[in-house]
């Protein structure tokens, strides 16, 4: 029983360490999109905090794959893991 408890503790701690630091990720976005994602980047983009979680995730995945043609966003999205993208998509709509 003791081994099971120790193993569960290790797994829980490892999960915390692997969790995406969303606040660190959004710092790189603020210059163009605003701290609360309230701006149109370069006067062109959608206002991201008005988008749904699903829309944000789909757009970031499309930028990452190159399906959305925008060299700046494609370069940024390629740096993100799928987990990072899901975390951002979940977090950004909370900034309204």
Swiss-Prot record:
Q: Which Gene3D superfamilies match?
A: Cytochrome c-like domain
Q: Which domain of life is it from?
A: Bacteria
Q: Name one GO molecular function term.
A: electron transfer activity
Query: In its keyword annotation, does this UniProt entry include Mitochondrion?
Result: no
Report the SUPFAM superfamilies cross-referenced here: Cytochrome c
For this UniProt entry, which residues form the secretion signal? 1-19
Binding residue positions for heme c = 29, 32-33, 73
Function per UniProt = Natural electron acceptor for a formate dehydrogenase.
Q: Spell out the protein name for this chain.
A: Cytochrome c-553
Q: Which organism is it from?
A: Helicobacter pylori (strain J99 / ATCC 700824) (Campylobacter pylori J99)
